Amino acid sequence: MRVLPDTPNLDFLRQEAKDLLVALRETDPTAALSAAQRAVADQYGFRTWPDLKAEVERRRSMPPTADSGLARDLADAFDLGDVKVPMTPISYAFMGRRWRLETERGVWLVGPVFDWIGDDQASRATELRERARAAGVLAPKPVRAADSALVRRVDGKSWRVDEWMELGPEVLQPVRSSVARQVGRTLATVHEVAMPSDQVFTPFAPGHLTYRHSDAEWDQLIAGTSAAGKPWTDDLVRLREGTLSALESVPFRPAVEPLVVSIADLNIEAVRMAPDDKLALIHWDFAGPHRPEWELAYVLVHWTVYGQANPGTARALVAGYRDRAGAVPPLNLSSFWLTITAHLNWTYDQFCTARSAIGDEKRAYVEGELQQLIADQLTVTKIEQLLEELQPLT
């Protein structure tokens, strides 16, 4: 489920519905705008378009506010100059709320990041982003403090800053084939400029893309969820005993060639459309060692398996990759091992967090994620169907 911005732009939502209508008409020429509007409302968790519009009005009438001291401290930490106006809330995301900060030296996007994202990680992600920007990928420019730091601790959290970039609507499923093609071209461009890495990928080592929880850990999660009286305990049991166990059986195949540092999380929420209908990549924080084959598999799952993807979206994405790279990494079931591991860990983490989430926003966000995980399950069968659809493209 998508989360509405803190001060939603109704014009953006109307544009999202129009874009969605184009995508719907790629498979059903008779699709009406009302169907696209219902689909937009549904993806934001509302039954009807009028319900969504009512929520837009409610949010705009009472946006979140930040302490004036936070704006001042952020501006001081990153040497941005004196604050001109109170910070404007942008949206609540999985790492926390992002804000628009205006100072005498410019306009900035500021947001918290996970504690494990320090300067070394941010520097790696920034180098990749700058290489990609130089190669034509649209992305905001990261900001360094006076001492060149990219991450600063402010008010008990780690923060990063980007120069403000005017962006258009979010991208919703199903995506237009032209957007899918842009995603493929963009991924190929990132792979083209990716830095070499001397890291060796070790299955089950610590890390979101490598570590897998033991049966005992899953049993403890189920027991804790049950003891807390959570209504989704039975859903968790069914997931664990069914699709998740089947996914764990997919074998790992080691990389033959050295790994590269790539974006590592090019999902549908990591992008926005720019005013010229060009794709902009706004999330680079997780950049790390990868293999083009594995990352293409990850992107295909996130853009063409999750959600209500159109038939042909995967082929359009792969065609876009070939447009830029000239060739496509061959894929098989083992190519999805990292994607599966990330899905297993995301599922585990969301059920853990939901058990003790504090605050209405955090609770609403994570419970929305649980609904999605339960309703739209990743399965081995879906991956096999994806591979079959792509033949003979890959």
Place the predicted regions along the sequence by residue.
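Active-site activation/catalytic loop segments of kinase-like enzymes and analogous catalytic loops
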Residues: E293-G326, I340-I358
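Active-site acidic catalytic loop and adjacent metal/ATP-binding pocket
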Residues: S91-E104, L109, P142, L247-W294
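Intrinsically disordered, low-complexity eukaryotic regions enriched in glycine, serine
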Residues: M1-M62
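ATP/Mg2+ or Mg2+-diphosphate-binding catalytic cores
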Residues: G224, W346-T394
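ATP-binding pocket architecture of kinase catalytic cores
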Residues: E102-Q199
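Conserved NTP-binding catalytic cores of kinases and kinase-like/nucleotidyltransferase enzymes
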Residues: S61-D147, A274-D277, E388-T394
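A cross-family kinase active-site recognition segment
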Residues: Q173-D235, E257-L259
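A glycine-centered beta->alpha junction motif in the catalytic cores
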Residues: S158-Q173, D219-A227, H343-E361
